[in-house]
Amino acid sequence: EPDLLVSILGNEIFKKPIINLAKKGCINLHTALLPKYRGLMPSFWVLKNNEEFTGVSVFFVDEGIDSGPIIVQKKVKINNLTQQELIKITKKIGMDAIAEAIDLIEKDDFDLIENDDSKKTYYSFPKRSDVKDFYNKGKRFF
């Protein structure tokens, strides 16, 4: 029986039998500041939407899409990054955030941050028109 399940950038929706498998729950790393940018490819969408900041969120998984209570968030300034550069940065700070969350859970010393549904945004895979708009805004993948 595991103590904790850790999902990193998971794109599966877990059901209760998996979520409840571990004594201390299941956590996931999402590369955006939840509750905004739930769903897929947040690095694309924060760049396309000209956000000044993004970050990572480590949260307890529930049966929703990136909707569980947040344990740790880390913020990063975007500047003029390419998507590839942003992914590299958020993966690095994401690993630090996962380690911090595991430590807090192990010590049972954390205050959950509400993942407020009323403030959520959700994104899926970009359409051709989204990619065109991305390029028109001077954004780059590489």
Locations of the language-model features?
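Donor/substrate-binding cores of folate-linked one-carbon enzymes
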Residues: 4-129, 133
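SAM-dependent methyltransferases
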Residues: 139-142
